[in-house]
Design a protein with these regions (language model features):
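Asp-based, Mg2+/Mn2+-dependent phosphohydrolase catalytic module
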Residues: 2-30, 35-54, 64-89, 93-306
């Protein structure tokens, strides 16, 4: 585990690290680092190109409910050249693979009937190929599967909108029955074009408060980092993670024994007192926030820039 409270002074750009350290694999978060969900951050596309040109193996590691292929399509649509990436792994991809293979004892013991919490406005998640039966009655379910926070899936494949309060009432009934829950996106919130959205991790935290068992897929848990490093085909000591969430990206890097770069202008921007893009956070404020989350980056950078 890499968990040193010694944080370096904020850097000017990635070029400093590329020229002084020999990291073969760069594990990049997407939201808050490359883009805001709607458009790339200034300089992100050219920085990615420079990093790839320098010979880095770049792997997207994302707490997204969606499959890895969907994530790559989104990045392409935002203007990022797919050829710059070695691959991608998402929490949604891990969830899909685990439910499909069932080679882990925990997943092997699951039944086939589930309550499915998903998205509506953001686009529902397909369960095709998983041999699952979506049910609406908690009494008929074997487990709860949380891909989103906006809707409830139906046996027909359609979804109907639900409020957070309505979903939490379903969770109360599920916890009372002792159903396990799989959360396909551990993020609590995300920022999309400066608008905060509640994510499935919030439902999972509520479920744990109710006494329910939660299987957390994705960051900050080690499994997704191991998958990303395997895609790159390198050793952990040859990898560095880049992210804007202390709790997920930086904590996950600490737990996985790899170094990290904290992008301050993302999800923690307001907490750090930042008011504009590429504004530099004070080292003291970063240290205080890192201690609060018990997550310590190796390097600090205001934005993903060269």
């Amino acid at each position: 585990m890499i968990c040193s409270s010694q944080i370096s002074q904020p850097m000017n750009g990635l070029k400093d690290i590329v020229e002084t350290r020999n990291f073969k694999a760069w594990l990049l978060d997407q939201y808050g680092v490359l883009h805001d969900g709607k458009k790339p951050y200034p300089g992100a596309i050219s920085t990615l190109k420079n990093l790839a040109t320098a010979g880095a193996k770049i792997v997207i590691i994302s707490n997204s409910s969606r499959r890895a292929s969907t994530t790559m399509e989104k990045l392409k649509g935002l203007g990022f050249d797919p050829s710059f990436f070695t691959g991608a792994i998402t929490s949604g991809e891990l969830t899909h693979q685990s439910l499909q293979r069932r080679d882990d004892p925990w997943f092997a013991a699951l039944g086939r009937s589930c309550i499915h919490m998903t998205w509506n406005d953001r686009g529902a998640i397909s369960l095709e190929g998983l041999d699952l039966n979506v049910v609406e009655d908690v009494e008929e379910a074997d487990f709860v599967l949380a891909h989103g926070t906006e809707a409830l899936g139906h046996p027909s494949g359609c979804v109907s909108p639900r409020t957070l309060d309505e979903l939490e009432k379903i969770l109360e009934k599920s916890a009372a029955r002792g159903l396990p829950m799989i959360v396909a996106n551990p993020d609590y919130v995300t920022v999309e074009a400066n608008v905060f959205h509640i994510m499935p991790g919030t439902l999972a935290s509520k479920y744990e408060e109710l006494g329910g068992e939660v299987k957390w897929m994705g960051k900050p848990h080690k499994m997704i980092y191991e998958s990303a490093i395997a895609i790159a085909g390198v050793n952990p000591c040859e990898s560095i993670a880049v992210g804007d969430s202390l709790h997920h990206d930086i904590k996950g890097a600490n737990v996985s024994g790899i170094e990290s770069i904290f992008i301050t202008g993302g999800i923690h921007g307001n907490e750090l007192g930042l008011t504009s893009f590429d504004e530099t956070a004070s080292l003291d404020s970063v240290k205080t926030l890192s201690a609060k989350h018990n997550a310590f980056p190796t390097y600090v950078l205001s934005a993903f820039k060269w």
